[in-house]
Curated annotation (Swiss-Prot):
UniProt record, GO biological process: miRNA processing; post-transcriptional regulation of gene expression
Keyword list, A-Z: Host-virus interaction, Metal-binding, Nucleus, Phosphoprotein, Repeat, TPR repeat, Zinc, Zinc-finger
Xref: PANTHER family: MICRO-RNA BINDING ZINC FINGER CCCH DOMAIN-CONTAINING PROTEIN 7 (PTHR14928), ZINC FINGER CCCH DOMAIN-CONTAINING PROTEIN 7B (PTHR14928:SF6)
Phosphoserine PTM sites in chain numbering: S217, S364, S367
Any single Gene Ontology cellular-component annotation: nucleus
Name of protein: Zinc finger CCCH domain-containing protein 7B
Location in the cell: Nucleus
Keyword Repeat: yes
TPR repeat locations: 1-27, 36-69, 82-115
Organism expressing this protein natively: Homo sapiens (Human)
A UniProt-annotated Pfam family: zf-CCCH
SUPFAM superfamilies in the cross-refs: beta-beta-alpha zinc fingers (SSF57667), CCCH zinc finger (SSF90229), TPR-like (SSF48452)
Region (Disordered): 365-403
GO molecular function ontology, one term from the record: RNA binding
Length: 977
């Protein structure tokens, strides 16, 4: 109960400091001290439970609140800040972040140079970083202070061996000296005091004593877990109830030991008068509305399936928002109608502007009878001698006005400012002609609309007709930008109709792009609850829409930095497959959704909690959420839908995995039936490919040589003797037009075939393809014909195509070429067995690739393609309206003088305020991406060269005097996070 109360106090306290409610300076200082002490104590409990990640969150929150207090001229005791740094260093060290642990240890020593624990943490961190000489110096000081501590002794011996020093035997003083109390003022007593000052026996433990001498600050209260600190302050954050009274002061009996005298007693009595007397003349409103909108349980306005238990997005940031947010830039959110709307950029984390609907939505949760313009409503005459509850407890809270539940905050619509959307059906939006785009909207038609068609139009477009937005094509592995259909551009009829995977108009491109990024869900545009009905969401439907599988992975490995993929082994399923750690798999497993296409994507599905919000985190979508598991929002659409599924069905994670296995067993059965009928040749396409073909060595082909394998099919016949494997060979086809060999790549997707294969626009123009991934457009007419032949005959493997050609042209020589039995068949539908090889190793979520060893991982994170992924994404082309920043973040001098800029798009300065604002926003996004990549250890710690992106990461002060040669000069500059 005591810990639950402390958690509630922390939650309320964090919400209170994010508001702008007034408070006396003395009470405010004591309130901040109590909040930091609670965070310190909660972090200690989590550390003892070995939940180091959450303990780190509490310590960081406590230090963040301390920084916020310092910015408000409130100084907290240095002893408490020192212990926070020491314990946070312990968390960092346990998690393997030795640089961070060293930094915190040095900060703690800056606050208290005599802190032995801080010195010990520093020594251990230096030891792990390979700085053994410095570590030995720190360890020696610890050994002199605590010569009998096992942890100190062990560390000293380890460092001595590494430095090649001789470990001498320690001197023991005669025991008779202690027996006859001859060491009353000697070192023995001092050692005992230091070793057990916090109630623990080893210096390797964390600091736990958070009691602070009240003489260090005139407005500080002693830390006692049983005495509530300013209940009238914390109660401002809870719904008012007429039955609530001020807690009694029975817990003061704890001070009956008579140890409080002098100034301590005066300070204690002053603080008690504050608690008992309430806020005399303070800013406590007589009728204060709730700061957090809460739906009454069981309201009939919500669907009966979900009831009133779905939490609503709060206008206040979550409890741990200060973890990644500057305290001086906190967003003050309240239901008081005197608030002005926030500016376009509130903080680097709030780069997505708040829409007007988010602020207006607060008005529907009840009206306020007073405002900041009426200071009299905030004054309440109270008698400091009366033990009566505050005025808010005497009067019942005003009942909220009857209104519809405000679910506007659940609607994630990033296109609200530029697009309009409407629902329709076949009756009000019928097809009026034979062509693909012949539809007309009948406005004002009286009928019962099914609302199963999404219509949209651009607000700024001259064409204000409603256009149908088809469902996004998901049966394709294409990951590039969407393009308009060539037939629709030429105002011709598209022969593929609704099956065309190209967009029919710009509105369709915009919606599809946002849907793929995860920032828009058409099901939530008009129904925030997503039309949740019993049976509408099933695991089979989720897997059919999102592909992939659900499985369990080791959560400790998955959350580690860098991310490690491991699951239970067959030999010992109770232990994870990470041989270096061998975590208990049953106690640390987590549900993960895995999709394997051109890359690997792992989406962690957290266990649904009541305080979670049914919305996708905007930070995760844009550059990765730094709060990770402590975030209250979903980090993917698949996680959001699983939460909805759990909300109404009560399914557990084990049930989800079992349903996933059943679904794939059914798919395997269907795939087996389909494969049995693939033996006969198809009647709708040619049975063989007429062009001459052969396999050659891929490495030799890149050097311009056509080299076939040897007779044993183990090596190529060149002098280099390259290994002959499926991955290192290339299929060549003789071009009749060019009369030379042309390489043919494997099918870009073996799961979903497009209607037709088109030539790559770069290859058509005789240029090299600029696409980073596996381009799904053919790079030659021969490649297009080969892919079309394979699609029509349901041939999924290049080897199978070659075997069919070889059988026709060399029927009497079946032994020539690569034998049919050596091919590795591929299945049209990926089964769970296809994921067996991706269940272990390091994982890079930026590139979607796994590495099997540390060496391979280091090579990957140092590659240029990987660094490019840190700063780019598939949505960059459609997410920005202006040029890429050219080097200088200021307006062009020529344009400011009204002259034309001769450099045009090559000008290094911005051509307008809007372009400059976008450049500044883009720089902040890139900084956040870099911070996320560094936090996840996707970059080498000392890697500070990012090529053309270096000038974007300079500080504002450096940019003010930037010269036109800034990008070149910045090639060796250190990036700033």
């Amino acid at each position: 109960m005591e810990r639950q109360k402390r958690k509630a106090d922390i939650e309320k306290g964090l919400q209170f400091i994010q508001s702008t409610l007034p408070l006396k300076q003395e009470e405010y200082e004591a309130f901040l001290l109590k909040l930091v002490q609670n965070l310190f104590a909660e972090g200690n409990d989590l550390f003892r439970e070995k939940d180091y990640k959450q303990a780190l969150v509490q310590y960081m929150e406590g230090l963040n609140v301390a920084d916020y207090a310092a910015s408000d001229q409130v100084a907290l005791p240095r002893e408490l800040l020192c212990k926070l740094h020491v314990n946070r260093a312990a968390c960092y060290f346990t998690m393997g972040l030795y640089e961070k642990a060293l930094e915190d240890s040095e900060k703690a020593l800056g606050l208290d140079s005599e802190s032995i624990r801080a010195l010990f943490r520093k020594a251990r961190a230096l030891n792990e970083l390979g700085r053994h000489k410095e570590a030995y110096e720190c360890s020696s000081r610890c050994s002199l202070a605590l010569p009998h501590d096992e942890s100190v002794t062990q560390l000293g011996q380890e460092l001595a061996q590494k430095l090649g020093l001789r470990v001498r035997k320690a001197y023991k003083r005669p025991q008779e000296l202690e027996t006859f109390s001859l060491l009353s003022n000697g070192t023995a007593a001092g050692v005992a005091d230091q070793g057990t000052s916090n109630g623990l026996g080893s210096i390797d433990d964390i600091e736990t004593d958070c009691y602070v001498d009240p003489r260090g600050s005139p407005a500080l209260l002693p830390s006692t877990p049983t005495m509530p600190l300013f209940p009238h302050v914390l109660d401002l954050l809870a719904p008012l109830d007429s039955s609530r009274t001020l807690p009694s002061t029975d817990s003061l009996d704890d001070f009956s030991d008579g140890d409080v005298f002098g100034p301590e007693l005066d300070t204690l009595l002053d603080s008690l008068s504050l608690v008992q007397g309430g806020l005399s003349g303070s800013g406590v409103p007589s009728e204060l509305p709730q700061l957090i909108p809460v739906f009454p349980g069981g309201t009939p306005l919500l669907p009966p399936v979900v009831g009133g238990s779905i939490p609503v997005s709060s206008p206040l940031p979550p409890a741990s928002f200060g973890l990644v947010m500057d305290p001086s830039k906190k967003l003050a959110a309240s239901v008081l109608d005197a608030l002005d709307p926030p500016g376009p950029t509130l903080d680097p984390l709030d780069l997505l502007p708040y829409s007007e609907t988010r602020l207006d939505a607060l008005d529907s949760f009840g009206s306020t009878r007073g405002s900041l313009d009426k200071p009299d409503s905030f004054m309440e005459e109270t008698n400091s001698q009366d033990h009566r509850p505050p005025s808010g407890a005497q009067k019942p809270a005003p009942s909220p006005e009857p209104c519809m539940p405000n679910t506007a905050l659940l609607i994630k619509n990033p296109l609200a400012a530029t697009h309009e959307f409407k629902q329709a059906c076949q009756l009000c939006y019928p097809k009026t002609g034979p062509r693909a785009g012949d539809y007309t909207y009948r406005e004002g038609l009286e009928h019962k609309c099914k609302r199963d068609i999404l219509l949209g139009r651009l607000r700024s477009s001259e064409d204000q007709t409603w256009k149908r937005i088809r469902p996004r094509p998901t049966k394709t592995s294409f990951v590039g930008s969407y393009y308009l259909c060539k037939d629709m551009i030429n105002k011709q009829d598209c022969k593929y109709g609704d099956n065309c995977t190209f967009a029919y108009h710009q509105e369709e491109i915009d919606v599809w792009t946002e849907e793929r990024k995860g920032t828009l869900n058409r099901d939530l545009l008009f129904d925030p609850l997503g039309g949740v009905k019993r049976g509408s969401l099933t695991i089979a439907k989720l897997l059919k829409e999102h592909q992939g599988i659900f499985t369990f992975l080791c959560e400790i490995c998955f959350d580690s930095k860098p991310r490690i993929i491991s699951k239970g082994t067959k030999d010992s399923p109770s232990v994870c497959s990470n041989l270096a750690a061998k975590h208990s798999f049953y106690n640390n497993k987590c549900l993960v959704h895995i999709v394997r296409s051109t890359s690997l994507k792992y989406s962690k599905i957290r266990q649904f909690q009541e305080h979670f919000q049914f919305d996708v985190c905007r930070h995760e979508v844009r550059y990765g959420c730094l709060r990770e598991d402590s975030c209250h929002f979903a980090h993917s659409f698949i996680e959001l839908k699983v939460w909805l599924l759990q909300q109404y069905s009560g399914m557990t994670h084990e049930d989800i995995v079992q349903e996933s296995k059943k679904y794939w067993q059914q798919m395997e059965a269907h795939a087996g039936k389909a494969s049995s009928s693939m033996g006969a040749p198809r009647t709708h396409g040619p049975s063989t490919f007429d062009l001459q073909m052969k396999f050659v060595c891929g490495q030799c082909w890149r050097n311009g040589q056509v080299v076939e394998p040897d007779k044993d099919l183990k090596y190529c016949s060149a002098k280099a003797r390259h290994c002959w494997t499926k991955e290192r060979r290339v299929l060549l086809v003789m071009s009749k037009a060019k009369r030379k060999w042309v390489s043919v790549r494997p099918l870009p997707s073996i799961r979903n075939f497009p209607q037709q294969y088109d030539l790559c626009i770069h290859a058509q123009n005789g240029r090299k393809c600029q696409y980073v991934g596996n381009c799904s457009f053919a790079h030659s007419p021969e490649e297009r014909d080969m892919w079309t032949f394979m699609k029509e005959n349901k041939i999924l493997d290049m080897q199978q195509t070659y075997d069919m050609w070889l059988k026709k042209h060399n029927p009497g020589k079946p032994g020539e070429g690569t034998p049919i039995s050596s091919r590795e068949g591929e299945k049209q539908i990926q089964m769970p067995t296809d994921y067996a090889d991706i269940m272990m190793g390091y994982h890079c979520w930026l590139c979607g690739k796994n590495s099997n060893s540390k060496k391979q991982w280091q090579q990957h994170i140092q590659s240029e393609k990987h660094k490019e992924k840190v700063f780019t994404s598939d949505s960059d082309a459609s997410g920005w309206a202006f040029r890429f920043p050219m080097g200088e973040f200021r307006l062009c001098d020529r344009l400011q003088k009204g002259k034309a800029c001769p450099d045009g798009d090559k000008c290094r300065c911005a051509h307008g305020q809007e372009e400059l604002n976008e450049w500044l926003d883009r720089r902040e996004v890139l900084k956040q991406k870099l911070a996320k990549a560094r936090k996840d250890m996707l970059l080498c710690p000392r890697d500070d060269d990012f090529g053309k992106y270096n000038f974007l990461l300079q500080e504002d002060g450096d940019l003010a005097g930037a010269t036109p040669e800034a990008p070149a000069a910045a090639a060796t500059a250190t990036t700033g996070e």
